[in-house]
UniProtKB/Swiss-Prot annotation:
Domain Rhodanese intervals: 130-224
Name of the featured protein: tRNA uridine(34) hydroxylase
A molecular function (GO) term: oxidoreductase activity, acting on paired donors, with incorporation or reduction of molecular oxygen
GO biological process: tRNA modification
EC number annotated for this UniProt entry: 1.14.-.-
SMART domains linked: RHOD
NCBIfam families: PRK00142.1-3, PRK00142.1-5
Pfam family, one: Rhodanese_C
Catalyzed reaction equations: uridine(34) in tRNA + AH2 + O2 = 5-hydroxyuridine(34) in tRNA + A + H2O
Organism of origin: Streptococcus pyogenes serotype M3 (strain ATCC BAA-595 / MGAS315)
């Protein structure tokens, strides 16, 4: 039986001098021990997800904790059967979380170490979910929400996190005087976003400490009131959260049946994320529209080595056709 792989999710807001140099040093160490993953390092802190066997991940955690700046860094640990990443990336960025404010090119003046929302543990957050007078706001991207979310949480009419501040400004009159609690995957986005909400004048702002990942592992709440699965930015794509009464909320793009399997549209110029069963992926050659299904650079066709005749037959079976110039 192969050894389990550990996936580490973590972040910390802390001042890092010479962050660009530290990023290079960090990458060198990660590669030297065979770690895989993706890490962002900025002047304001560090944010990463990495994976490896027990020995490798333990070496990494010990090395990180040996730096006094990260001595108390909180690693959230999952156990999996296979690697969550194929390569190792460490990138220097201006920020580990960018709010995309029009009046502020960078968000360095929003320092979570100085201004942030009240930390709520899983039990307190569950109580907030059950409180009719509390507004629960999902701060993630739309495709993350669609895979899974807390019951009753607001889904902002946005595509990505950078659009959220403007959405809040446009809708602040609806919940300015109410208690607002926010959540995200591991907590890093909420640290900064809840601080921004406080700066905007919201009087009572809370955040799920440790994010959804921590809520799902809490022995008392066990992920209850979470519907669906949690989206993660690695090869796993999704992980279960609700261990009490799990449900599937996402629906197959093609037939509307329950489905948690995310794929990217095979048209490289579209790349839209859609839910699709293996059967429907095959049937629709992973294209989200007739144009994408017949696109000359359809990746599903290329990956599966379909001949032009096989491709045309797939499309004919669903009432579509392949233009003469495509695949000729």
């Amino acid at each position: 039986m192969s050894e389990k792989i550990r996936v580490l999710l973590y972040y910390k807001y802390v001042s890092i001098e010479n962050a660009q140099e530290y990023a290079a040093k960090h990458l060198e160490f990660c590669k030297s021990i065979g770690l895989k993953g993706r890490i962002l390092i900025a002047d304001e802190g560090i944010n990463g997800t990495v994976s490896g066997d027990y020995e490798t991940t333990q070496k990494y955690m010990d090395w990180v904790h040996s730096d006094e700046r990260f001595a108390d860094l909180w690693f959230k640990i999952d156990e999996e059967n296979q690697q969550a990443f194929r390569k190792m990336f460490v990138r220097y960025k201006k920020e580990i979380v960018h709010l995309g404010l029009e009046d502020n090119n960078f968000d360095s003046d929003i320092n979570p170490l100085e201004t942030t929302g009240e930390y709520l543990n899983p039990k307190q957050f569950k109580e907030a979910l059950l409180d009719e007078d509390t507004v629960v706001l999902d701060t993630r991207n739309d495709y993350e929400y669609d895979l899974g979310h807390f019951r009753g949480a607001i889904r902002p009419d946005i595509r990505n996190f950078r659009e959220l501040p403007q959405w809040v400004r446009d809708n602040k009159d609806k919940f300015m005087e109410k208690r607002v609690v926010v959540y995200c995957t591991g907590g890093v986005r909420c640290e900064k976003f809840s601080g921004w909400m406080v700066r905007e004048g919201f009087k009572d702002v809370g955040q799920l400490h440790g994010g959804i990942a921590t809520y799902g592992k809490d022995p008392e709440v066990q992920g209850e009131l979470w519907d669906g699965a949690m989206y993660v930015f690695d090869d796993r794509i999704s992980v279960p959260i609700n261990h009490v009464n799990p449900t599937v909320v996402s629906k197959d793009y093609f037939d509307g049946t329950p489905c948690e399997r995310y794929v990217n549209c095979a048209n490289p110029f579209c790349n839209k994320q859609i839910f699709a069963s293996e059967e429907n992926e095959t049937k629709y050659v992973r294209g989200c529209s007739p144009e994408c299904r017949a696109h000359e650079r359809n990746r599903y066709v290329q990956e599966n080595g379909l001949s032009r005749q096989e491709w045309a037959e797939r499309l004919e079976a669903i009432g579509e056709s392949l233009p003469e110039f495509v695949g000729a």
